[in-house]
């Protein structure tokens, strides 16, 4: 009984503060300038980003800085295609600003090498074009540009473990500045190659990433990182890849906490039901493995979310067309056991919901389906997590309770180990309590003068914010 009284005594002030702050938040939304509201949300403690592709989260500027610094790229040299020769061979992708490593460059014919220039030798105009080629920043760019061109352009940057590790730290630093506590990102250990082009064993790569995360600059960000391994379901060997990654994650549960499946759904290869038998086979061989799977990232109705739940997923990535499947929608509303990972800016830029006012997010949120906000491929959107929060607040008039529950959901439904999750949740609640106390007074927004948001191209193009780039 004494323990219960103590717990209630600790919890009651938090509840009172939250209740008091609800009215305060409504006043802030009514009276603050757009820039002040954005700054307030930038300073807001946030939980986790649990739908995140590390390769897509890295800003072009971070890629360039690491790839051109021998101290950060493991002594490698990167080249990018600046024009095409007349003897390009059939089957070779004609992708301007496709980036390759020195080992690949040295295997090209002299004519092939003539198409490429070192990243360090680009003119100012070429460098800017290279940077812009790695993000959606122009009218008309959308799904086709993203899937067919941007990923191939980034090319072999993803193979260099030094570059990936260093840009991961830059990503963590940016998240830490926004008040994020947990990043659950999709990144494997199977595709790294050394400077000779030889495959790095997954065990070696996993240890390298683990050691890098233990360094002081990584720890100083205040961001806890865990990985998901991701199967590209459209590949011919997707079933084999699924089995291999399932076994890998089972053997590396300290850092890899779950498994994902990604890839465009708009063909028969994206049909989740074709993997049902394989998942059931794997569950007969391995202990429970947490699954978060992309589903419902489609224009029209289908049953992909339902079929993905049958694979064993406890989290759904995107779920845009879930609203067109009433039976599955009702199931998620009533059970409240499955989290839908919402990616507003991604869904807008990839044209699944060009008009975000029509996004099903508020319907899910306000009918009891657990949801959270995430960035998906923030580097390629040239955005950040605060952009997602600002979009949600200004488009759907979120209440304070809804706003804080989004962060809470991201941690509660994370795949972090129970002890880690409990610590993250406790830290989040304490940070929110301190935040509400700081901004409860009517004149408290004056203290936002000490907050310096860092925004990127998306915020500038969408809202015209004059914050630092």
Regions found by a protein language model. Name each.
Residues 19-291, 297-315, 321-338, 343-469:
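Metal-cofactor-binding active-site regions of metalloenzymes
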Residues 6-15:
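Bacterial N-terminal signal peptides
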Residues 1-4:
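Positively charged n-region of N-terminal signal peptides that target proteins for export
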């Amino acid at each position: 009984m004494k323990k219960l009284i103590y717990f209630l005594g600790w919890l009651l002030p938090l509840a009172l503060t939250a209740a008091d702050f609800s009215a305060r938040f409504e006043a802030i939304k009514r009276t603050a300038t757009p820039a002040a509201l954005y700054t307030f949300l930038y300073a807001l403690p946030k939980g986790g980003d649990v739908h995140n592709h590390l390769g897509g989260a890295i800003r072009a500027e971070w890629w360039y800085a690491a790839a051109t610094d021998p101290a950060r790229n493991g002594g490698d040299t990167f080249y990018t295609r600046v024009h095409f020769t007349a003897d390009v061979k059939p089957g070779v992708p004609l992708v301007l600003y496709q980036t390759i490593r020195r080992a690949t460059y040295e295997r090209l014919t002299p004519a092939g090498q003539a198409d490429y220039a070192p990243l360090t030798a680009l003119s100012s105009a070429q460098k800017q074009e290279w940077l812009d080629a790695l993000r959606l920043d122009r009218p008309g760019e959308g799904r086709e540009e993203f899937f067919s061109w941007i990923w191939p352009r980034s090319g072999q940057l993803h193979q260099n473990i030094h570059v990936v590790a260093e840009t991961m730290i830059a990503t963590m630093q940016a998240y830490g500045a926004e008040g994020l506590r947990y990043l659950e990102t999709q990144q494997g250990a199977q595709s790294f190659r050394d400077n000779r082009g030889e495959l790095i064993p997954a065990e070696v790569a996993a240890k390298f990433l683990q050691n890098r995360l233990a360094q002081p600059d990584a720890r100083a960000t205040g961001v806890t990182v865990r990985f998901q391994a991701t199967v590209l379901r459209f590949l011919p060997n997707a079933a084999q890849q699924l089995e291999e990654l399932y076994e890998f994650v089972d053997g590396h549960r300290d850092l890899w906490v779950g498994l994902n499946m990604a890839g465009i759904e708009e063909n028969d290869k994206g049909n989740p039901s074709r993997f049902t038998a394989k998942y059931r086979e794997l569950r007969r061989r391995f202990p429970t493995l947490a699954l978060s799977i992309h589903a419902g990232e489609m224009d029209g109705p289908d049953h992909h979310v339902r079929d993905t739940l049958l694979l064993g997923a406890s989290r759904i990535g995107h779920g845009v067309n879930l609203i067109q499947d009433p039976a599955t929608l009702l199931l998620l509303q009533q059970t409240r056991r499955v989290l839908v990972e919402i990616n507003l800016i991604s869904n807008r830029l990839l044209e699944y919901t060009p008009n975000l006012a029509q996004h099903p997010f508020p319907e899910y949120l306000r009918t009891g389906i657990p949801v959270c906000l995430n960035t998906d491929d923030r580097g390629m959107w040239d955005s950040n997590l605060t952009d997602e929060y600002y979009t949600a607040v200004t488009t759907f008039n979120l209440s304070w309770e809804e706003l804080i529950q989004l962060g809470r959901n991201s941690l509660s439904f994370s795949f972090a180990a129970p002890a880690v999750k409990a610590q993250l949740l406790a830290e989040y609640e304490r940070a929110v309590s301190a935040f509400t106390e700081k901004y409860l007074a009517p004149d408290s927004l004056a203290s936002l003068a000490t907050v310096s948001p860092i925004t990127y191209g998306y915020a500038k193009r969408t809202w015209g914010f004059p914050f630092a780039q």
